[in-house]
A protein has these predicted regions:
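Residues that scaffold the ATP/ADP-binding catalytic core of kinase and kinase-like folds
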Residues: 33, 49, 136
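Non-DNA-binding regulatory cores of transcription-related proteins
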Residues: 117-123
Length: 156
């Protein structure tokens, strides 16, 4: 059985010669007190019969509340610690983090309380330099930054 697949968008912009990437902070009680090493790209599962690029664009919109306005291009594949393969697409565009409006998920909280609560999939979004992103994002996603740097250098 193949490992689960997900797809995501590494949105980037170039300002004054410096590259920045947009990362989101996952919502919910597990992530609420985590910051360094907790940020990630907008991503999610690829539905049966769905193209990875379409899934990446859909997940971007679900987790940010904004449609992807740039054409995504294949960047890399990353295997996360649990074995899931993430197909990453790069797109150059701007996004205002203040406009973040993520879809929500429901879970029992507190545990064993019988109470269901809703939490946003992403509670914050932020532009970060590549150096800051390396420190702040999930370790398993950091190779995406190397792939983006290599892609941008090859375009020069």
């Amino acid at each position: 059985m193949p490992p689960p697949r997900s797809a995501g968008i590494l949105l980037y912009r170039r300002l004054a010669g410096e590259t920045e990437v947009l990362l989101i902070h996952p919502g919910g009680p597990y992530w609420s007190s985590k910051d360094v090493g907790a940020w990630m790209i907008p991503k999610g599962g690829v539905d049966e019969g769905e193209a990875a690029q379409d899934a990446a664009a859909r997940e971007f919109e679900e987790e940010t509340g904004a449609p992807l306005v740039a054409e995504p291009t294949p960047l890399c594949r990353v295997r996360q610690s649990g074995g899931k393969i993430v197909e990453v697409f790069a797109a150059e565009a701007d996004f205002d983090p203040a406009t973040l409006k993520s879809t929500e998920f429901e879970m029992e909280w507190p545990p064993r309380s019988g109470q269901l609560r809703r939490f946003p999939e992403a509670d914050r979004a932020r532009w970060m330099t590549l150096a800051e992103a390396r420190r702040m994002m999930l370790e398993s996603q950091r190779p995406m930054l190397d792939a983006l740097e290599a892609k941008l250098q090859s375009m020069r």
